[in-house]
A protein has these predicted regions:
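Short, flexible turn/loop "capping" segments at secondary-structure junctions
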Residues: 172, 196-199, 237-241
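N-terminal helical cap/lid subdomain that shapes the substrate entry/recognition surface
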Residues: 18-19, 73, 201-202
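P-loop NTPase Walker
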Residues: 1-35, 39, 111, 134-135, ...
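Short regulatory helix/loop adjacent to the ATP-binding pocket of P-loop NTPases
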Residues: 22-28, 180-197, 214, 218-221, ...
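Coupling/hinge elements of helicase-like and P-loop NTPase modules
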Residues: 60-70, 82, 86-87, 204-241
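Coupling/switch/interface segments within P-loop NTPase motor domains and analogous charged loops
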Residues: 42-108
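Conserved helicase NTPase motor core
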Residues: 12, 38-44, 90-193, 205-215
Length: 241
């Protein structure tokens, strides 16, 4: 209603993963995958990890395949390839994950499949390795808005930076104090260091709260103030005590 039907049709509203999936539907063949690909579910992923463990002579009775899969996913969210850590650092699971990762990826590709994390990683690879794809997407998406920015991971940030191109027309909405998903890869530093990735940023603080009483907000302000690694803000309300 605000922008009109014609302009509304020009908008793309979706999650990071839905966006990545659409990019892959159009361009994944450029990376040697079939034009029609499948998205592996949790059961498929676990099966492929167990196969990779057998191929590398790793006993799945000694190492939990589910934990290995979780570490593979964690690495993908961070945008890194698991590698053996220097002696004295890490543990045996780091070594197992580093050994399993390449075989797991090859097994996915051999089946014409990607996993959920690949919906972010493979579009990044496409943009890096195929300038024509990057130019097309940067031109198509000139303005980018990301909600709940404190919940983004490193791979999502990398994709956003590449899509923003030289224009860097990015609006992020989020609250570092509400970052609670680090256990699944979210990095609060993405919002804390926003101005490093997108210079000349204008910051707008939305400190008025419409849900809680001032007594609750005072308690919340006191608790969160202990955290030194945050954007300074103080919530208030017009609702009274």
């Amino acid at each position: 209603e605000l922008v009109g039907r014609a302009n509304a049709k020009l908008l793309t509203v979706c999650t990071f993963h839905a966006f990545g999936c659409e990019v892959l539907r159009r361009h994944l063949w450029r990376l040697g995958y079939p034009k029609r690909f499948a998205i592996a579910d949790a059961s498929d992923q676990l099966s492929l990890v167990k196969r990779a463990m057998r191929e590398t002579k790793i006993d799945d009775r000694s190492f939990d395949a589910r934990r290995v899969l979780a570490l593979v996913s964690k690495a993908k969210c961070a945008g890194v390839v698991p590698e053996p850590k220097p002696e004295g650092m890490g543990d045996e699971y780091d070594l197992v994950t580093a050994a399993v990762f390449p075989r797991y990826q090859l097994a996915l590709k051999a089946q014409g499949a990607v996993d959920f994390d690949d919906l972010i990683l493979l579009p990044i690879r496409l943009l890096r390795e195929h300038p024509e794809v990057r130019e097309e997407l940067v031109e198509r998406y000139r303005y980018l808005l990301v909600d709940e920015y404190q919940d983004t991971n490193r791979s999502q940030l990398d994709l956003l930076v590449m899509l923003a191109g030289e224009r860097k027309n990015v609006c992020a909405v989020g609250d570092d104090d509400q970052s609670i998903y680090s256990w699944r890869g979210a990095e609060v530093d993405n919002i804390l260091s926003f101005d490093r990735h997108f210079p000349k940023v204008k910051e707008v603080r939305l400190e008025q709260n419409y849900r809680s009483s001032q007594a609750i907000l005072d308690a919340a302000n006191a608790v969160i103030a202990v955290n030194e690694a945050r954007k300074p803000k103080r919530l208030w309300t017009a609702r009274g005590l």
